[in-house]
Amino acid sequence: VGSEMCIRDRYDMSLTDNSTIDSRSGMNPKEQLDAIFAAVAPLYKERDKTYSEIKKLLNPYGVCGLSIKELEQQEKKYVKKYFKDQILPILSPQIVDANHPFPHLLNKELYVIASLKQNGTSMIGIVPVPQFVSDILYLPGHDIRYIRMEKVIMEYLDVVFDKYEVSSKNYICVTRNADVSPDDEALEINDDFRLLMQETLHKRRRMAVVRMETAEPLDKELEKYFCDKFKITPAQIYRTKMPMKLDYIFSIMDKVPASLKRSLIDEPFTPQPSRYLTDGKVIPQVKKKDILLSYPYESMDPFLRMIKEAAYDPTVLTIRITIYRLAKKARLVEYLCAAAENGKEVTVLIELRARFDEQNNIDWSERLEEAGCRVIYGFEGYKVHSKICLITYRNRNNIEYITPVSYTHLRAHE
C-alpha cells in the first residue's frame, strides 16, 4: 500500500467472491446484482410514466417543460441566440479517437454525446454540460415555459462539432459506486481517521460505474463501446424519458406565484409542541417526571432547549452524545460548543461514514474539536446510527443523569 490508501470497491465484479452464498437470498453476489438490475428496469418505466403525468397536469397552470420541437418560431430564435452568445463560448467539447483517450466522466453529471465522422473515420464527441450554468433556460413570457440545458446543447451539436458530420446525438449520465470504505490496512497505519476519510472521499470520484442512463436508445456498437469502457453489462444501461438531474425543480418552485403554489403543493408538515411540556425550562420538568416525545410528529425543540440549558447550567458536569447526520446549520453543535467553552466535559461520537454526509460531518467535527469537545469517530467494524445522549449533573451529594434515548427524553438516577 505504501503511502497510498486502498479503497474496497465492493461493486467491482473482479473483486467479488462469487463462491459466497448469502444465507437469506440463497444467491452469490453476481446473482444478487443481476436480480437487482432486472428489478430496476420496470421501475424506470413506472417513473417515466409518473413524470409524464405530472408534466401534463402542470401544463394548464402555465408550467411547461418543452423540447425544441415544441417551441414557437420566436422562441427557437431566442434559444439559438442564447446558445451562441452564452453557452457555446464556455463549452469544453472533446473528441475521442485513436489519439484522444476516453475522458473520466464525473458521478451524476450530464454529458451530451455524438457519433461523428470525418473523412470516413468514426469517432465520438463528448460535451460536459457546464455545472456553473443554469440547468434550464426560461423562455420569454408570463408563463413558466422552459427547456433543459442538455436539450439545448444537444440540439446545436452540429454547431459545436462544425468540422464533423454528426450522425447521432444523445445525453448520458453515469452513477458511480458510493460505498467507500477505508481499507483495514490503511486504518492500522493511519491514526487520523478524519484525514483518512477525507482522502477516502476523493477516491469516490473514481469508483466503478454501477449505472449508465441515456435519453435515447444506444445502437449496438455504441452500447458495446460504453460497456467495455465502464466495465458494465447492457443490463446496467437504462433509457429514461425523465430528467436525469432534478435540481432545477427548486428553481421552478421559486418562480411559481405563492397563490398558485398553495393550490399545487401540500401544506408543509409542522411538528406539534408536546402537551406534556410548558415553555419554561426543560430540565426541571424532566427531573419531575419522564417525558416521551415522538419525532417527527412532535417538535425537536425541547431537546435542543435542554442541551442549551445544560450548556449553561453550573450543576452539569458532562454531556455525551452520538451524532449520525447534521444539517448545514446545526443549533445542536452551537450548544455543544458553548458547553465545552463553559467548562463542561463534552464527548461527541460523530459517525464520519454517514452516506453522502461524510464531508459535512468532517466539517462539524473540526468545529467541535476547536471548541474543546472530545470527538470520537465511531468504531472499526461498526457504523453508529443510534441517537443517544447522556447529561450528567451534580445534585447536592448525588450524581444524576438525564438520558434522551433516540432523542426521546427520559430520566435516570444513580
Residue positions per predicted region:
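A residue-level signal for conserved active-site and pocket-lining positions in enzyme catalytic cores
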Residues: 87, 174, 319, 388, ...
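Extended, highly charged clamp/arch subdomains and adjacent linkers
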Residues: 3-243, 264, 288-289, 295-298
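Primarily the HKD phosphodiesterase
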Residues: 87-90, 103-105, 312-371
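Phosphate/diphosphate-binding loops
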Residues: 352, 356-410
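A short acidic, amphipathic alpha-helical/loop segment
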Residues: 225, 305-306, 331-336
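Active-site cores of enzymes that catalyze phosphoryl transfer or operate on phosphate-rich substrates
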Residues: 234-317, 397-402, 406-411
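Flexible loop/turn segments at secondary-structure boundaries
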Residues: 72-75, 134-135, 181-182, 218-222, ...
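Conserved small/polar residues in nucleotide/adenosyl-binding loops
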Residues: 2-9, 408-414
